């Protein structure tokens, strides 16, 4: 059967489904919808003269056409999220962007917002970025943001255009945030001279940028960060060494799985499970050469702290502070989901292999030695987390210096009676208040560094206070819940929630004091 016959049959099929006669002008003359029986494509009683035809009956040809339709069962080979080819939707690419049609201006604005949202930054920064681009293009916009999507309405000269953009997943990329900041400075200076295609070429450069670090480098960064984290929690050399191995293996596996395009929770559970098992194997290995090494099992919690969602937790609080409730609640829900999944997997593995979150043994260090080591380990921890967020080395070092000051100050305030004995204090500052002060100091120092180094403020503040997130408290609360110890579970949970709540409050206060645009609602 040739192509012309197939097209004729397809047109006949479409004509059968025309319920109404388009040529009739009056409603009374329209045909009534036919019953479903009349649409039987397979004629069970063929006419007598059909038997004399040399061509196959029409019903057979219809069945042949329908059988050729592609059928999809099981796993699809392609991605389920459709990717936008921005160059194909541009109508006036060689025209200056300020004089382009509203649809082309909307594509520039929405692509800019998409790249910022995909970088993991908060709703206020995404909206601010889109507003600045729209201001250059002479467009008024209204944006409704969530964790993975936004709806943007563009208004210009009495015309209105609405566009929706969605992402397949979320993550953190501070280097891309920095690139977008440079892009904004460029267009705010020369943006009226660029064509639509030139805008999209600049945005394509940002979008196609590769991660700065390979999975093994991400694993090494997590190993250093979690090893330092264990010391700051009170662990010793054995716990630090085993956490180094566990976190390195776990985050390497997690980064490799994410690089393959698999789901975040699959990577999360695999990474946490491997981290706990690797910690135990490293502990067994040390037990062969160090007597009593098996008594240092409590450090396994530190091996899984690389999954703590510091960026979503902090940006959720900042979004809620700016009344971006939809984005803030979704980010908070996402962060809580990660914490719950990670702690459940950690508890399950710990129960299977016999690990328990006991208290760390005292190290017996002098106040001066402890303070100096806290400064060093805070720097190492923040530097490692910054690398995990894809910060360039210099940016990670700047965040590490800020974290070394603010986190050491926080820990010193909590342990004031022993760290500053000449003050004669009987008790230290509550951890919640100390977390607020630490976050406030991080925000103020980041404001100074932003002026000198041109790094985005959020790329410095969030990594510097991620190390203050009470991952140990969160895990212990879930552990005691799974063991039905309600009293301990509530105690650790309330402590963790209060500390997490005060961290974005401290950053928000610092931002309010130093950023006029943040202070005002419009």
Positions of predicted regions on the chain:
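C-terminal transmembrane helix-loop-helix hairpin of multi-pass membrane proteins
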Residues: 10, 15-20, 29, 34-39, ...
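Core alpha-helical transmembrane segments of integral membrane proteins
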Residues: 211-316, 386-389, 393
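Hydrophobic alpha-helical segments embedded in the membrane of multi-pass proteins
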Residues: 220-224, 244-252, 272-273, 375-381, ...
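Hydrophobic alpha-helical hairpins/lids featuring a short glycine-rich hinge
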Residues: 166-243
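Short juxtamembrane and helix-loop transition motifs at transmembrane-helix boundaries
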Residues: 197-210, 223-235, 254-262, 353-367, ...
């Amino acid at each position: 059967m040739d192509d012309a016959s197939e097209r004729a049959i397809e047109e006949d099929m479409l004509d059968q489904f025309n319920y109404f006669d388009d040529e009739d002008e009056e409603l009374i003359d329209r045909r009534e919808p036919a019953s479903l029986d009349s649409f039987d494509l397979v004629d069970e009683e063929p006419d007598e003269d059909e038997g004399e035809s040399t061509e196959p009956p029409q019903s057979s040809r219809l069945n042949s056409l329908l059988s050729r339709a592609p059928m999809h069962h099981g796993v699809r080979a392609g991605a389920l999220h459709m990717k936008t080819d921005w160059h194909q939707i541009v109508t006036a690419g060689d025209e200056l962007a300020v004089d382009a049609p509203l649809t082309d201006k909307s594509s520039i604005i929405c692509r800019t917002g998409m790249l910022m949202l995909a970088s993991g930054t908060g709703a206020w920064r995404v909206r601010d970025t889109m507003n600045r681009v729209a201001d250059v293009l002479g467009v008024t916009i209204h944006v409704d943001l969530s964790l993975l999507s936004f709806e943007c309405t563009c208004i210009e000269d009495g015309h209105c255009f609405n566009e929706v953009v969605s992402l397949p997943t979320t993550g953190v990329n501070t280097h891309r945030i920095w690139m977008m900041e440079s892009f904004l400075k460029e267009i705010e200076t020369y943006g009226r001279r660029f064509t639509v295609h030139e805008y999209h070429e600049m945005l394509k450069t940002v979008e196609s940028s590769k991660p700065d670090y390979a999975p093994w480098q991400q694993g090494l960064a997590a190993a250093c960060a979690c090893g330092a984290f264990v010391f700051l929690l009170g662990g010793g050399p054995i716990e630090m060494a085993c956490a180094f191995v566990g976190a390195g293996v776990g985050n390497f596996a997690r980064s490799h799985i994410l690089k393959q395009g698999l789901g975040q929770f699959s990577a999360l559970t695999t990474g946490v499970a491997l981290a706990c098992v690797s910690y135990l194997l490293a502990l067994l290995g040390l037990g062969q050469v160090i007597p009593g090494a098996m008594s240092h099992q409590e450090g396994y919690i530190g091996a899984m702290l690389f999954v703590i969602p510091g960026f979503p937790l902090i940006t959720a609080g900042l979004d809620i502070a700016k009344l971006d409730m939809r984005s803030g609640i979704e980010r908070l829900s996402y962060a809580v989901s990660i914490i719950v999944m990670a702690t459940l997997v950690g508890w399950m593995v710990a129960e299977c292999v016999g690990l328990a979150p006991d208290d760390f043994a005292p190290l017996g260090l002098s106040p001066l030695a402890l303070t100096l080591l806290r400064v060093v380990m805070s720097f190492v921890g923040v530097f490692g987390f910054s690398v995990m967020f894809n910060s360039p080395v210099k940016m990670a070092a700047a965040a590490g210096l800020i974290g070394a000051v603010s986190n050491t100050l926080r820990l010193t305030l909590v342990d004031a009676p022993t760290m500053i004995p000449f003050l004669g204090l009987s008790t230290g500052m509550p951890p919640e208040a100390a977390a607020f002060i630490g976050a406030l100091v991080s925000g103020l120092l980041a404001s100074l560094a932003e002026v000198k180094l041109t790094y985005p403020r959020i790329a410095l503040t969030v990594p510097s206070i991620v190390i203050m997130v009470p991952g140990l408290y969160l895990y212990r609360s879930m552990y005691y819940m799974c063991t039905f110890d309600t009293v301990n579970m509530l105690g650790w949970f309330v402590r963790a929630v209060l500390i997490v709540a005060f961290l974005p409050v401290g950053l928000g206060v610092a931002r309010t004091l130093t950023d006029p645009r943040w202070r005002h609602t419009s």
